[in-house]
From Swiss-Prot:
Disruption phenotype: Mutation within HVO_1886 or HVO_1887 causes nitrate respiration deficiency. Its EC number is 7.3.2.-. It comes from the Archaea. Its main location: membrane. Keywords: ATP-binding, Cell membrane, Membrane, Nucleotide-binding, Translocase, Transport. GO terms for cellular component: plasma membrane. SUPFAM superfamilies: P-loop containing nucleoside triphosphate hydrolases. It is an enzyme of class 7 (translocase). One of its GO terms (molecular function) is ATP hydrolysis activity. ATP binds at residues 68-75. This is Probable anion import ATP-binding protein HVO_1886. Part of an ABC transporter complex involved in anions import. Responsible for energy coupling to the transport system.
Amino acid sequence: MTTERPDAGDSGSEKPDETAAPDPAANGARRSKTRLAARSLGHGFGDGAVLEDISLAVEPGEILAVVGPSGTGKTTLFRLLAMFERPDEGTVEVGGDDVWDLPEARRLAVRRRVGMAFQTRSLFSTTVEENVSYGLRVRRSWSARVRDAVEGLFGRDEPSETVRDALRTVGMFDKVGRDAGSLSAGEAQRVAIARALAPDPDVLLLDEPTSNLDPRNTAAIESAMRAARDRGIAVALATHDMQQARRVSDRTAVILGGTCIESGPTDAVFESPDDDRVRQFVEGKLVY
């Protein structure tokens, strides 16, 4: 059973720098975002349960860290949240709708409002620009607005402003014309995150996005998470790095043994957890 902690204190002519991250204030006209929630999720493979009775939510304009040791079901949870698989039990809700109760066409439209970058960095053998543009090109089959925005994208001499913004957010605009195959692992992950951000999702799911990366790339990705949050995107981060969770997240959910046993404001979860197992885990005394 999850212990939910209440939030504490609810309360000139100069040429622009092309590599600078976009100003969140400039995005005031963006449509409002929606929340993503899981209710009593259960899922397994064969006879074994991987997840049991998981309930959590990520709100627009916040970063939720889902922490737990490797192999505890975080990736499976994120695949369910991204609607790649249907849960055996419980519901996934976007904007209050149970996505698996929606007609298929509506569910696919809702799915496209959720961006995800996996721990395994998979890019196409094209340029950085074309990789980031991919998500927009997929969307044009169902959205006239996006279709008009990206029509002829690959034939342009300059990348679209949408692609520019996404690459600025992850600090990769200077690599826009590079072949993706020439990037380092950290640079490739940053491009994958830019690709997830380009369609302006309501929700961004990041599964261990900085695993085995150097400090420079880790810092750039953490900066991108904060920028996405400042744009009103609901950001969920799966990580076993508790220090990272403390640096970037507003709230934290702790997964142990396939169950969410505590969630709440990050400082409260780490400094005064209600569950003894969480206390032992954050102190490095509990091993799964």
